[in-house]
A protein has these predicted regions:
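Short, contiguous alpha-helical
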Residues: 2-6, 10, 14, 24, ...
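Acidic/histidine-rich alpha-helical segments that form the ligand environment
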Residues: 94-132, 140-152, 158
């Protein structure tokens, strides 16, 4: 019996797509899920929350958003034909506190996600075993997809943690609400 997985691909004994196509569809859905979770957390922030740092060594939500956007532009622009670490990227600058408004950061974020998802959506199953380079290191496209999904998941988790911390009692759960705690 077959059923539809979270990505929309058929799974089970009568699988109608090959494993490469299934992996691509699953990865596309996972990237979109990371974006959605981050955006649901970002939507709960007040403008002043974006630049709060828990301590001098911590990143604010604004820094994390700027870093993710810089990483996405670098990794996904000309993904199949150029190194994923572009010379014009100012990675160190992504981690300097700035004064960008939430609107400007959201525009940068949306643009970066547009590049990312357009690139991933354009991939074909045969591309998964092609070799790309990131910081001079050869990786299969499948490895690069998984590596970036892991990286983004870490930062999305940071965004969610910070947003939940900053919003306190006004936080709206992104999934199943936790039961009230005693004491």
């Amino acid at each position: 019996m077959s059923e539809q997985g979270e990505s929309g691909a058929m799974i089970g004994a009568e699988m109608t797509v090959d494993i490469s196509q299934h992996l691509l569809e699953t990865m596309r859905a996972a990237y979109r899920r990371q974006r959605m979770l981050a955006e649901r957390a970002l939507a709960q922030l007040l403008p002043a929350d974006w630049h709060v740092r828990l301590d001098p060594e911590s990143n604010s939500v604004a820094i994390i958003v700027r870093h993710m956007a810089g990483n996405m532009h670098s990794r996904w622009t000309d993904f199949l034909v150029s190194d994923g670490e572009k010379p014009e990227r100012d990675r160190d600058g992504e981690f300097r506190p700035g004064e960008q408004t939430p609107e400007a950061l959201t525009e940068e974020w949306d643009d970066a996600w547009d590049v990312t998802l357009a690139t991933i959506d354009a991939l074909e199953p045969d591309d998964l075993l092609r070799v790309v380079t990131v910081r001079g290191k050869p990786l299969s496209v499948a490895e690069a997809l998984l590596r970036q999904l892991d990286h983004y998941g870490q930062h999305v988790g940071q965004i969610i943690f910070l947003a939940k911390h900053l919003r306190g009692a006004s936080w709206s759960s992104l999934s199943i609400s936790t039961p009230p705690r005693d004491g």
